[in-house]
Structures are given as structure tokens and as C-alpha cells.
């Protein structure tokens, strides 16, 4: 998919590789910018990934990340099915060892990894009717269904009913669908090691 994206836009000099984000095997200090988007939310030890990002940045280079904080996802008017889905989603992530609210923690992870000039901002989106992201929370819970059932967070019937009711509510064009927060953080690798 990434190769098709690059080729479709005529981007040259792009190498696509698959690697463990904790140990990429790439040379240290070889990038002006190291960026990750919605990666840390999916790993149990995000500090290891941040350490690798810092290792890859050249002295004076930048590390940036965009990570979600799922706590703020909502809809208006509120609906109990959507609210319950928004409870099941982070509970499933947490039980898998990931942090669904990692966005707010990224600046601190960057500081602990030795970055300076750390900054942070956050964005929220309103998903209009017809936008595929409008049902993202419901879609993700549907995709995690086997895990949810195995963990005992909800039963088959409850999941079916929640899915149908939440989708019907979001199908109403009068319903306002609000994303969780997306935190953007950045920091600079010091030009020389601190003493």
C-alpha cells in the first residue's frame, strides 16, 4: 500500500521497509525528522519506540508524533449505545497492554527520552454525515469483537445491539460525531550529548 501511494504520486527516492519500531536496524543519527502517527497507541512499551526514534534522529534533528486520546470521543445528542462502545474500546486496548489515552503522555515520553524544545498541540474533528471516520469507533469495536468476547467485556447479543443502535444514531444527519483528541508533539534531539 505504501509503495503504491509513493508510486502513484511520482515520489522518487522512497524506500519502503518493514521493521520492528523498537529496533529498526537503521543507522543512528541518519534522519533530520523521525515521525510516527498512531503507532504508540498500539504498543505495550511506547518508551522503547520513542527511544528508537530519538536514536534515529541526527543531532539537532526533530522527532514528532501524532497520537490519539480516545477519552474525548462523543456524539451529540448523547446515545447510550455509543457511550457504551466508547467504554468497551479503551478497555479492550488497555487489557492488551496498550494505552488508549497515550496522546496526552507523548510530550512526557519525549522529555524522558532526552528531547528538548518539546511542544504539544491537540486537534479534534467533527465527522459529517457520509464521512467514513464517523463510525470509526463502532468499526474498531466490531474488528475487536473476538477479543472483546474472550475478555468478557460484552456478550454477542449486546455487541450486536450496540452496533445497530449506534450506527442508526450516527446515520441521523442531526447527530454531531466528535473524534477523540489527536495530540501532536515534537521535540529536538540535542546537538551534543548533555553532561
Give residue spans per PLM region.
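A short SAM/SAH-binding and catalytic strip from SAM-dependent methyltransferases
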Residues: 32-47
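A short glycine-rich, Lys/Arg-flanked "PGG" loop and its adjoining helix->strand segment in the class I
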Residues: 47-62
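Conserved catalytic/acceptor-binding region of the Class I
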Residues: 64-131
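Core SAM-dependent methyltransferase catalytic element
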Residues: 113-116, 137, 180-195
Amino acid at each position: 500500500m505504501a509503495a503504491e501511494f509513493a508510486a502513484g504520486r511520482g515520489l522518487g527516492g522512497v524506500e519502503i521497509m518493514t521493521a520492528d519500531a523498537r529496533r529498526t536496524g537503521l543507522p543512528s543519527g541518519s534522519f533530520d525528522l523521525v515521525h510516527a502517527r498512531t503507532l504508540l497507541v498500539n504498543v505495550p512499551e511506547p518508551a522503547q519506540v520513542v527511544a528508537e526514534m530519538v536514536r534515529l534522529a541526527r543531532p539537532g534533528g526533530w522527532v514528532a508524533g501524532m497520537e490519539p486520546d480516545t477519552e474525548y470521543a462523543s456524539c451529540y445528542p448523547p446515545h447510550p449505545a455509543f457511550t457504551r462502545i466508547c467504554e468497551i474500546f479503551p478497555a479492550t486496548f488497555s487489557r492488551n497492554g496498550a494505552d488508549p489515552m497515550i496522546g496526552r503522555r507523548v510530550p512526557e515520553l519525549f522529555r524522558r527520552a532526552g528531547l528538548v524544545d518539546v511542544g504539544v498541540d491537540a486537534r479534534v474533528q467533527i465527522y459529517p454525515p457520509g464521512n467514513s471516520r464517523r463510525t470509526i469507533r463502532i468499526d474498531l469495536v466490531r474488528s475487536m469483537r473476538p477479543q472483546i468476547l474472550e475478555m468478557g467485556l460484552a456478550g454477542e447479543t449486546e455487541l450486536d445491539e450496540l452496533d445497530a443502535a449506534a450506527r442508526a444514531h450516527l446515520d441521523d444527519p442531526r447527530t454531531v460525531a466528535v473524534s477523540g483528541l489527536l495530540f501532536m508533539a515534537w521535540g529536538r534531539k540535542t546537538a551534543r550529548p548533555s553532561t
